[in-house]
Amino acid sequence: MGLNIGGAETHIVELSKELKKRGYDILVASNGGVYVDELVKAGIKHYNVPLNTRNVIKMYRSLRLLRKIIKEEKVDIVHSHARIPGFVTGLHHSLDFTFVTSAHWVFNTAHGLKYLTNWGQKVIAVSEDIKQYLIDNYNTPEDNIYVTINGIDTDKFSPDISGSEIIREFGLNDQAPIVSYVSRMDSDRAMVAEQLIDIAEQLDSRIAGIQFLIAGGGDVFDKLKEKADAVNGRLKRKCIVMTGARTDINKIVAVGDLFVGVSRAALEAMSAAKPVIVAGNEGYIGIFAEDKLSIAQENNFCCRGCEMSDRQKLSEDILRLISADAQTKADLGWYGREVIFKFYSVSKMADDCIKMYEDAY
């Protein structure tokens, strides 16, 4: 696992910073990435360990490096957030430490991959449906499973944040509607990004000057950038901006008149009081409002178990939001922010993890 753009990665950073504030001595080991600087600025030591690959040589190197870190730093608790770190940590049974994990998503269990997964002494799931997945697929005892949320920094993601730097950097027109989207641009994450690119020309014919600000990097970024450039060429203007990987996600969100995305990114946009269309690779919830809260919470705003996203649904909901009056959009945005304050604070996320640590220790 690395620390590039992603919901689990941001979860780790926010949790680490909150635990550090509460007096815990925090160390983070990962393959590195754009969020390392944020950890270092918070006074958190980071170790580069190749925990992002099943390559046998690199896994052996990770095994040796983790053993050295655990022994030299006298680590009491190891908290793993992905399959490979969990597997490697689980091989250190002989060392005296407490081992816990987080389940951020549902893993592929085919081809023996199930047996690479070690959930530790206790595991904390980020939604109720992932808790059930652990019980059904791994026979994890229910008493060993805790449930938490993705805690959001409501000062960092606030309606008071300005997006003016982003407007200038990318030459956007702040007098025309802007749709923001944030995700890793990987094949298993970027379906909705591609759908937005595919509907851009159709929406351009209905909404004068509409712009799409799409943030994130990954293995399909170049392919999507090529498609976006082709759309811009046909429209003879900069309709779609592909930013690549960014750490200033709060400013990307601030620029948008509305936001499209899932999971932590959707929650961050809600915290910024933006109207949000919840859509991702696993499904489609649509325009977030009070009637969507229950289903969204059940699957951690990831849309698991919902109808699939498609171009028509996206087009209709984008048109509906952009055409809505200012009060309707403001009400949707402020309702979303209220939901974050009530259910998704960083403080609650840290409290949940501390309870697990204390029970396992």
Describe the residue ranges of each PLM region.
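Conserved donor-binding/catalytic core segment of Leloir-type glycosyltransferases
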Residues: 172-193, 197-201, 213
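Nucleotide-activated donor-binding/catalytic signature segment of Leloir-type glycosyltransferases, i.e.
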Residues: 223-246
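N-terminal strand-loop element at the rim of the active site
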Residues: 1-6, 10-12, 17-58, 217-223
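A short, well-ordered alpha-helix in the C-terminal region of glycosyltransferases
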Residues: 320, 327-343, 355
